[in-house]
Amino acid sequence: MRWSRGRGGGLLTWLKRLIVRSVLVVIGAWLAGILLFSFLPVPFSAVMVDRQVSAWLKGEFAYVAHSDWVAMDDIAPAMALAVMAAEDQKFPQHWGFDVDAIGQALKHNERNTQRVRGASTLSQQMVKNLFLWDGRSWVRKGLEAGITTGVELVWTKRRIITVYLNIAEFGPGVFGVEAAARRYFNKSASKLTASESALLAAVLPNPIRFRANAPSGYVIQRQQWILRQMRQMGGDAFLRDNNLN
């Protein structure tokens, strides 16, 4: 009996150490990613890996998660403005979290349990795409908040929007604005017009359901709304005033 308890205790201790070490390794990888990707091109994201593995498991071997990294100088200014107009107009001002939007989302979700509203900023979306996974859970949101804080402390806003645009999903297997521009408009990201940029931004809430190459009435309406918001924000002057161009 003593031997059994001793062996069980030893196994429990080993498991605890394994868990602690695994957690430390993951945290270390995230910290390294925050530091390295503050200046290095991002080769792939967690969401890209998830999509690719899921496709393989389903036997969809023709699926390829594709992305082409481009610098901010090689992306049309309208594209950066479009995603901010669509997803996070307070992006230059906040430190990763839009408190007002969070409050509004909580009130909305209390009244409407069937249609949940999110309040994630571009910083949070970028962190989720780069380091984490899809889905709604308090664990993921907690990790997202912690990593977002680290990113906002280390990265510039220009870097955050650059990485966001390079890893955002714009359709099945289409990741990053360069791949999207090539796929849907047969041009480089630097040549995108305001209308094309707004169309790409319009599918971001759900790029699997919404298609830039076959936009629904809702997507077209959203595109037009984004274009109006871009004008109201001040166009290219908004980017210059916030050191984002």
Swiss-Prot record:
GO molecular function: pentosyltransferase activity; peptidoglycan glycosyltransferase activity
Membrane topology, from the record: Single-pass membrane protein
Compartment(s) where it occurs, according to its Swiss-Prot or TrEMBL record: Cell inner membrane
Top EC category: transferase
TM regions (residue ranges): 24-44
Coiled-coil positions: none
Pathway: Cell wall biogenesis; peptidoglycan biosynthesis
GO biological process terms, semicolon-separated: cell wall organization; peptidoglycan biosynthetic process; regulation of cell shape
Domain of life: Bacteria
GO CC annotation terms, alphabetical: peptidoglycan-based cell wall; plasma membrane
The protein's Enzyme Commission number: 2.4.99.28
Gene3D superfamilies for the chain: Biosynthetic peptidoglycan transglycosylase-like (1.10.3810.10)
Catalytic activity: [GlcNAc-(1->4)-Mur2Ac(oyl-L-Ala-gamma-D-Glu-L-Lys-D-Ala-D-Ala)](n)-di-trans,octa-cis-undecaprenyl diphosphate + beta-D-GlcNAc-(1->4)-Mur2Ac(oyl-L-Ala-gamma-D-Glu-L-Lys-D-Ala-D-Ala)-di-trans,octa-cis-undecaprenyl diphosphate = [GlcNAc-(1->4)-Mur2Ac(oyl-L-Ala-gamma-D-Glu-L-Lys-D-Ala-D-Ala)](n+1)-di-trans,octa-cis-undecaprenyl diphosphate + di-trans,octa-cis-undecaprenyl diphosphate + H(+)
UniProt KW keywords: Cell inner membrane, Cell membrane, Cell shape, Cell wall biogenesis/degradation, Glycosyltransferase, Membrane, Peptidoglycan synthesis, Transferase, Transmembrane, Transmembrane helix
Family indicated by similarity: Belongs to the glycosyltransferase 51 family.
Function: Peptidoglycan polymerase that catalyzes glycan chain elongation from lipid-linked precursors.
Name this protein carries in UniProt: Biosynthetic peptidoglycan transglycosylase
The species this protein was found in: Pectobacterium atrosepticum (strain SCRI 1043 / ATCC BAA-672) (Erwinia carotovora subsp. atroseptica)
UniProt gene name: mtgA
